[in-house]
């Protein structure tokens, strides 16, 4: 449900009550069959399409408020819904229905010499909190992935999308009720009171995990202040290293794709490192190609926008890139491991030994050899939909698809065995 606040309403209690209802719902979700979950996802898609006009009307109010507040065009585009985008969101729910159900899957197992049969099986996490910005499509994406993996979702979206998110969540709840599934499997927390985030991320014992999705400021604040376990879907200061043995045609193609395909996403390249052995040829060629695509280049070479340490650690999310000439592979790895965010790193090289060394030494969730950083994506990896790209090392790392929204339990079958004294 959508939790409303008033001047005298206790936001903390509202969040905790929503979490308690989510816990009850999560127990029912964990017992659903794959067919029941898939039917509910298709029903949600159908209900969303039928109520598209309601969603668009709510979104128009959010857009009008954002325009009045002077919101920049790129953020308005992220906030805006259209009939085509709603069609795409509904299609996404159907795609999730078509993905394998991770719940109940056996991770490993064995039969011990004493006859005990041991299996490690996937189970839902339970209650998953999502804190996210602008894009109202995340509301439905998070619901779909949570439902298929058997989790209840507590959603805290942006205040700029408050009316859109409220309309979407009510539609999803309606679809669940029609399928005899607890509507509290998806709830929307108040977005116009910042304290709702604090209460969500500190509701240990009520919420099993919180996943922040958005800019560096949001993610860092959630990870810093949370008591509930978090999964950091991190920022992407991604590098492309042009090695001494690189094919420069390939390097140019990869770099332009990694930087300009969608500069505002976390898997876009933000720094290009060029090996000194090929710098005389590679620098003028690659800088010319970048400029042809409207990219501003920051670096410590003549003709570039002067770079500072801030540039080496910057996630621009714009048509800007930092460029640095490095002495060798060792220097490239050192630079990446110093300034990278652990998201995606790429090397362009024809030297197999260098490629293997790079993949071994670079500390990142995904490492590309002769491929664009843009491929770090659940769908591109063949996993289907994702909730984000985890840059941490515990629980999940890389694209967070359905299996990453589960935990495991050990199930042991016996025939009266007892442990010797």
UniProtKB/Swiss-Prot annotation:
Keywords: Amino-acid biosynthesis, Cytoplasm, NADP, Oxidoreductase, Proline biosynthesis. It catalyses: L-glutamate 5-semialdehyde + phosphate + NADP(+) = L-glutamyl 5-phosphate + NADPH + H(+). Disulfide bonds: none annotated. CDD domains: ALDH_F18-19_ProA-GPR. Pathway: Amino-acid biosynthesis; L-proline biosynthesis; L-glutamate 5-semialdehyde from L-glutamate: step 2/2. It is found in: Cytoplasm. It is an enzyme of class 1 (oxidoreductase). Its EC number is 1.2.1.41. InterPro entries: Ald_DH/histidinol_DH, Ald_DH_C, Ald_DH_N, Aldehyde_DH_dom, G-glutamylP_reductase_CS, Glu-5-SA_DH, GPR_dom. PROSITE patterns: PROA (PS01223). One of its GO terms (molecular function) is glutamate-5-semialdehyde dehydrogenase activity. It holds the Pfam family Aldedh. One of its GO terms (biological process) is L-proline biosynthetic process. One of its GO terms (cellular component) is cytoplasm. Belongs to the gamma-glutamyl phosphate reductase family. Catalyzes the NADPH-dependent reduction of L-glutamate 5-phosphate into L-glutamate 5-semialdehyde and phosphate. The product spontaneously undergoes cyclization to form 1-pyrroline-5-carboxylate. NCBIfam families: PRK00197.1, proA. This is Gamma-glutamyl phosphate reductase. The gene is proA.
């Amino acid at each position: 449900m959508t939790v409303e606040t008033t001047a005298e309403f206790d936001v903390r209690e509202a969040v905790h009550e929503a979490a308690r209802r989510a816990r009850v719902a999560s127990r029912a979700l964990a017992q659903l069959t794959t067919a029941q979950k898939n039917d509910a996802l298709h029903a949600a898609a159908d209900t969303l399409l039928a109520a598209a006009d309601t969603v668009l009307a709510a979104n128009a109010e959010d857009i009008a408020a954002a325009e009045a507040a002077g919101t920049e065009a790129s953020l308005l585009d992220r906030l805006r819904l259209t009939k085509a985008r709603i069609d795409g969101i509904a299609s996404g729910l159907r795609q999730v229905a078509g993905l394998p159900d991770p719940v109940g899957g056996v991770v490993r197992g064995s039969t011990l010499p004493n006859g005990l049969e041991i299996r490690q099986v996937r189970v839902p996490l339970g209650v998953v909190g999502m804190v996210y910005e602008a894009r109202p499509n995340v509301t439905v994406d998070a619901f779909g992935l949570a439902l298929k993996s058997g989790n209840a979702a507590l959603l805290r979206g942006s205040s700029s999308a408050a009316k859109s998110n409220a309309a979407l969540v009510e539609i999803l709840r309606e679809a669940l009720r029609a399928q005899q599934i607890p509507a509290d499997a998806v709830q929307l927390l108040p977005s116009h009171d910042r304290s709702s985030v604090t209460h969500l991320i500190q509701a240990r014992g009520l919420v099993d995990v919180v996943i922040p999705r958005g800019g560096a400021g949001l993610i860092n604040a959630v990870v810093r202040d949370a008591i509930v376990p978090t999964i950091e879907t991190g920022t992407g200061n991604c590098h492309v290293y042009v090695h001494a043995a690189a094919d420069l045609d390939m390097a140019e193609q990869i770099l332009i794709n990694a930087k300009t395909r969608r500069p505002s996403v976390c898997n876009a390249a933000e720094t290009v490192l060029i090996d000194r052995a090929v710098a005389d040829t590679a620098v003028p060629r690659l800088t010319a190609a970048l400029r042809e695509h409207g990219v501003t280049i920051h670096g410590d070479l003549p003709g570039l926008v002067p770079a500072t340490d801030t540039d080496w650690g910057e996630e621009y999310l714009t048509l800007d890139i930092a460029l640095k000439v490095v002495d060798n592979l060792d220097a490239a790895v050192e630079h990446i491991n110093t300034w990278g965010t652990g998201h995606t790193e790429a090397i362009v090289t024809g030297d197999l030994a260098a490629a293997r060394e790079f993949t071994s030494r670079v500390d990142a969730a995904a490492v590309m050899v002769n491929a664009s950083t843009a491929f770090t994506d659940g769908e591109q990896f063949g996993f289907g939909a994702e909730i984000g790209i985890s840059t941490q090392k515990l629980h999940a790392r890389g694209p967070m698809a359905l299996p990453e929204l589960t935990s495991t339990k050990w199930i042991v079958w016996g025939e009266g065995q007892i442990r010797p004294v």
